[in-house]
């Protein structure tokens, strides 16, 4: 079966113009595993005669059940293109398909149902106007049904089709259908959907997919395709204020300067005023340039180069916006975060936050609560696990321009990237800026770090000792502190155990508390360095991310990481505090090296091995290195072995 439409040559231009004027509906299919999402879209395309003959022939070659005798085709294979998907019979990646009918154009995203691939579902839902949520008639509402419904609501999808699938497997019973619809309506009343349209279907056999089925005489509503062709979208979705993220400054010659990018939303015309979001500079559009020539006006989705009437500071990472509807510019905001990674989200840990325009270092300062997707109850939590949703306060290293996600999906979202693996570990939807950021200002001080350092006749530095418990960190740091003090240096030693008696007495030894422990100490060390001191920090600090965060707080060259490398068995043999004995007996939880991991530094400034060396000798070696370092003599490191 193939779809061929005969168009007389003289009508081609009229047909293309009519096609261009059709509205576009972006929708997703979602739900639990094996609810029939891919099969439904395959059936929709097949029965609407929108599948080409070569695609049908290919289904037989990939071994779809029944294809050889022509009686049955596995329509899910039209969407499941990955080899792993076909082998396992599940959807893994997001499959996008474009098709059109006489009434409307469609872009459909077939998203995976397995919990492990929730991140892919979020990707598909982020641009959708409508969600088809499938439910297996035999199983009813499952946890993944609830999760996908909640995420669809969170991502701003306003319209839902509740496709009660496999109705044939329950003998087309109206009671089963109505019970599922009632259960879902009760669940979804808190989600704020503008419309929910229930439809009983059989994706495999085509009941109520393209046309009404004789098997469900008790259902008098529209078939699925008919509803998709006629559902009305919110008009406000088509009228957002102008937003233009600058992707590149075009400077082909001295007489031309243009700002290239894609219009996120809204429209712009030659002569319209615009504002640079971060600086507030005002100007107007002198010309709109494209590859095909200049335009008088341009709108959402178009890639253009804007030539401005004045020279302004609008480099990559900034945004040109409408003067009467400017975005927020702030470095603190509240957001809903969906966590993707197997490693939990840690408040206090430094991540990379990427928006449509910016890429900045960011920290989750507070996890306010986790959202229970079954009951929507707010629950206290210290971290977010994979596929969990939480409300967080986030702080960025520099101000970013954004809108609230509910007002503008294009400029109100972000992703969170792990600094080590560069993997996308989370996605976020901005709720609102935190006004506290506007009320706190830096106060200019007459006496600065340089003045304090000059008075002490030394350069400030932060010597960060890291290693296992019992490695000798504190012993070596204490000996070095004694040597430097004898030389008249102004120092201070921050010891892990001592700090936990005061500043960090409220923290335990869970991974979340360890992250916060190091964050606080790093901030204290920064203040002490600002006072012109040589700061010795002796903490296990087991995670690379937190040591990197501490380094980034300091000025270039100020942070010196010292890896005190002692084998675990030697640390356990020494066991000066009896902690290893307790940990190995199961009496201490989350003990580094035994029941909690230690991430060794990959490229420390100093790597010292303690076995066979006296603490005093190692302290002297560090002192010699420090003398060269803060004295400006940057000779190659002579690491003690």
Curated annotation (Swiss-Prot):
Record: residues binding GTP: 31-38, 110-114, 165-168
The record's SUPFAM superfamilies line, in alphabetical order, gives: EF-Tu/eEF-1alpha/eIF2-gamma C-terminal domain, P-loop containing nucleoside triphosphate hydrolases, Translation proteins
Q: Which reaction does it catalyse?
A: sulfate + ATP + H(+) = adenosine 5'-phosphosulfate + diphosphate; adenosine 5'-phosphosulfate + ATP = 3'-phosphoadenylyl sulfate + ADP + H(+)
In terms of PROSITE patterns, this protein maps to:
G_TR_1 (PS00301), G_TR_2 (PS51722)
Record's superkingdom?
Answer: Bacteria
Alphabetized Pfam families for the sequence: APS_kinase (PF01583), GTP-eEF1A_C (PF22594), GTP_EFTU (PF00009)
Which protein, by its recorded name, is this? Answer: Bifunctional enzyme NodQ
UniProt GO MF annotations: adenylylsulfate kinase activity; ATP binding; GTP binding; GTPase activity; sulfate adenylyltransferase (ATP) activity
Which stretches of sequence are listed as region G5? 202-204
Q: What gene name is listed for this protein? A: nodQ
> What ranges does the record give for the region G2, renumbered to this chain?
89-93
